[in-house]
Amino acid sequence: MTLLNAPDYDDRRETRKRSLLIGAAAIVGLLILLTLGGFIAGHGWLFSNLPAEHKVSSFFSALEAKDYDKAFAIYTNDPDWKQHPERHKDYPIDRFTVDWTTESPVKAPIVSHKIDISKTDGSGTFGTGIIVAARVNGDKKLFMWYQRSDGTLTEPAPHELSGY
């Protein structure tokens, strides 16, 4: 093919190519923004820690409502724990209730909470767990550990978040 018999200029094809390039650039830009935004906001890359934050928030909401059975189910990640209480003989519901009322980490029943920030911790790409920082009963800081492998919660977390 020579310049003298080149195909005719197709305006629609060029417009489509330009639109696809702009769209691809916008998607890549949005992905970068979401990735960095989640990390900077303290919710993990691409907001990957949000499920753990929601679980901790649900746990505290159950404690505020004095629904200790539901809170225990969330804490142990075992919604059917009443079917097999022998699995939790090392940490039964009675001890759990005492630990989260009169002997709670804030030395009082939980009446309010706010999830502030979370950080991935441990080995691997997304870590073995997540430390979720919350303020309970006003301004008391509490750090909960969310174990990725089994979905259980633990208090206290292995360590506190620095700079929080």
Regions found by a protein language model. Give the residues of each.
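Short, low-complexity N-terminal intrinsically disordered segments enriched in polar/charged residues
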Residues: 3-61, 65
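Prokaryotic Sec-type signal peptides and long signal-anchor helices
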Residues: 63-64, 100, 130, 147
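Broad hydrophobic/π-residue packing in well-ordered secondary structure
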Residues: 59-63, 74, 140, 152-154
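Short beta-strand edge/turn micro-motifs at domain boundaries
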Residues: 2, 11-14, 19-20, 133-164
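Short solvent-exposed beta->alpha transition segments
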Residues: 58, 69-135
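Compositionally biased, intrinsically disordered/low-complexity regions enriched for serine, proline
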Residues: 4, 102, 106, 153-155
